[in-house]
């Protein structure tokens, strides 16, 4: 199962749907892009700046993430030219129906190239793009 960064963050810090995703993803083979390494750090720093987590919670969440990557509990696929070219193709394919953002296109491309389906995301644009491309999404019942 390919996780977008927002889902990874839900596994690291308490959000309204953290329990749901922790239970739903327990025991699944998880992957993402190397892009998540930078995006997770940025998301944790944003949560700290917005006073949603403390510095110690930020550090603990980062440690859990890096441990999960090092143990390959979350496998990070390389970010390379092939992924970027695929993301460019996805942007073109989804236009004008789905106004996909650049980093979301990169995640969608990495998911498609790795074939680590389904794409686990709650982002409406990513879910809509995945449907255009025929990529299975999770959770299935999330409104788009």
Where are these regions (language model features)?
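Metal-dependent nucleic-acid phosphoesterase active-site entry motif
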Residues: 1-18
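Short, polar loop motifs at secondary-structure junctions
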Residues: 14, 123-126
């Amino acid at each position: 199962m390919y996780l977008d960064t927002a889902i990874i963050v839900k596994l690291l810090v308490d959000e309204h749907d953290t329990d749901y995703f922790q239970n739903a993803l327990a025991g699944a083979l998880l992957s993402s892009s190397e892009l998540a390494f930078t995006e997770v750090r940025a998301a944790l720093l944003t949560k700290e700046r917005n006073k949603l987590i403390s510095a110690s919670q930020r550090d603990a969440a980062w440690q859990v993430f890096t441990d999960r990557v090092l143990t390959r509990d979350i496998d990070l696929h390389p970010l390379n030219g092939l992924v970027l070219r695929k993301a460019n193709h996805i942007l073109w394919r989804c236009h004008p129906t789905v106004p996909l953002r650049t980093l979301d296109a990169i995640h969608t491309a990495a998911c498609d190239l790795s074939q680590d389906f389904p794409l686990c995301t709650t982002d409406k644009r990513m879910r809509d793009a995945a449907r255009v491309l025929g990529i299975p999404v999770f959770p299935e019942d999330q409104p788009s």
